[in-house]
Amino acid sequence: MDYQAKIRDYASIIDDLFEKYQDDPIPAAHRLDEADCGKIEFARGCFMHRGFYCPSPIEEFVISNVRRGHLQKKRTASSIYEYKFDRAGQLREAIQPENPPYVETIWREGNFEIGLTATCILPMLRVVTLTERNSNFPSFYCAADTGNRRWYEFFQFNGCELEEAHVFDVKDINRDKDIQEAVLRHCPNLTEIMERVKALAVDGLAITDHHYLRFDKNAGKCFVRCDSPLHRTSEWTAPYKGISSAFF
């Protein structure tokens, strides 16, 4: 697969979503009415985007000490997320009751699941997620923040088992140039790295890290290779106990 081309295609969709919803980050057209709410769940111990219901099945293996968390039957002092589902069982809102609180509005368009994360007070769009699904399982997932960092993941399943994944850390060098220039003024030691990132860019997108993951169920291992133009390339294996599909 030409991942560079796929990333550019999806980047265009992400850019359109940012442009369309920048001034309407909690769109009324996709809000869940109280009368249409089917159930509410809570979760604790969540250290991933969207917590227990994060669309990515492999973030735990790439970022250390990242946990999906645990569902709770009711809200407690330890609850980090509140999830609201429609009557068809589709997740429609993921709420973090922090200070300030955040809400992710979630809906589906064709094979795509779109998520907009925004602050609830003086609404500001913070993160856009895009997930492409074949049946219930994702073939692609992207999380893009309002800065220039984007996280692209491509998956290959064999039935219900995840066999391999490609994860790309991508910088959009055309986004928030003023912020980048301000950072360099205060941290001139980053100039060399920024220039190396710019040299990697194709159509404004620079792949700074590429993790390839292969899951061997029989051997009980996850093989990970990191190819990075900015850091040392590495290979390693980790114990693999399988990935629950309960959240798909």
Language model: regions and residue ranges:
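Buried hydrophobic residues that stabilize the cores of well-folded domains
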Residues: 1-248
